[in-house]
């Protein structure tokens, strides 16, 4: 620090120091316009999640974790976030030795690349098959006595929801609570440090601490029995990762979590509503496919684009689950009363959801925001297909309606079966042999209109002349 001739701190000289230089030194950023790779950007999001508020400081490849406010405790929190997000285990020693964003990115993802080189090709038939424990449970339930009917009352619907603290899940939770027919929402697999974001003042919310990485999602045996007896519909909105993750790192949170939810649904054939991804349909090579099964279009066996692959695997697993239940129930000599109806499953592939509250990491919402700020539209010369946007509120309202209606239908059907103790008449037996027999419905939730890229660009530019923010966020695209 500058000093006076008397050896004291020179306050005037200190005040004249450029704050920008000091900020750059503290941040470890040598060049304000340093470009980041996609991997560095991915890790930066995790830094921003665990570090204290950075203010106007910008993280760059040369930023040092500890110079940006990090410490040993936050480094351990970052280590956990890396494991949960990417599935990569990295020691705190290696993270200490690679404290800049660029060095840490190489440390984490070079390790993953070496592991990927030794990985065997993925067998999708094995990945989407039913685990032996699940097959045993189905076989036992097919001939067992009916379970307790604690959840069959007529005083409202109880919903099991995963992903309640995510962008989509939080809006869906709010929508479910606004329905007068919803009695209670069981929020499962909520990380302990995110429970404060839930509406704790609402007594209809029951929170279960846990994570999708846990084989039981953190649910205790007693909590499991309660959920098996009470919930009427399971809405699986939770997921980890994105297209940069490999399937191996997302198998547990995105696919095996469905295995556990299936064990909860089976005793009373509780409806499962699975929120998949619109990217799954791209595996077919068709940019505007009909809402149908994608079983015939498996992902690549190298595990790349793991998020899409995990969602595809989840869809096909549910198809196999429903088919297996139907086969076992039809072959049982004296099936349980609850197994005389199909296990109902709905798969929803929602479009891009537009909301002013979307996180900065949401790429499409970020493009819309910057387009509004700059009053420019992106040039999409090589793009093909359609853009499907819709307001978040519109889509979650539709999902809520589907969830409540499916739960109500199952409640009424099972109440009637309890009274009559006779198999219900199947009026839809002549329907589609694939979709009807498996009790599976695939729904692609799209915006009101889908337009080709070129047409959409003209409409976009024209309507932005008026009130672009109102048009984008309230009316959908």
Swiss-Prot record:
Residues 410-435 are annotated as: Disordered. It is an enzyme of class 2 (transferase). Coiled coil: none annotated. Pathway: Mycotoxin biosynthesis. Residues 34-112 form the Carrier domain. Residues 411-422 have a biased composition (Low complexity). GO terms for biological process: biosynthetic process. Pfam families: NAD_binding_4 (PF07993), PP-binding (PF00550). Keywords: Oxidoreductase, Phosphopantetheine, Phosphoprotein, Transferase. Residues 161-322 are annotated as: Ketoreductase (KR) domain. Residues 424-435 have a biased composition (Basic and acidic residues). The modification O-(pantetheine 4'-phosphoryl)serine is found at residue 72. Its EC number is 2.3.1.-. GO terms for molecular function: oxidoreductase activity; phosphopantetheine binding; transferase activity. Polyketide synthase-related protein; part of the gene cluster that mediates the biosynthesis of 10,11-dehydrocurvularin, a prevalent fungal phytotoxin with heat shock response and immune-modulatory activities. The highly reducing polyketide synthase Dhc3 is responsible for biosynthesis up to the tetraketide stage. The role of Dhc1 in 10,11-dehydrocurvularin biosynthesis has not been identified yet. This is Polyketide synthase-related protein Dhc1. It comes from Alternaria cinerariae.
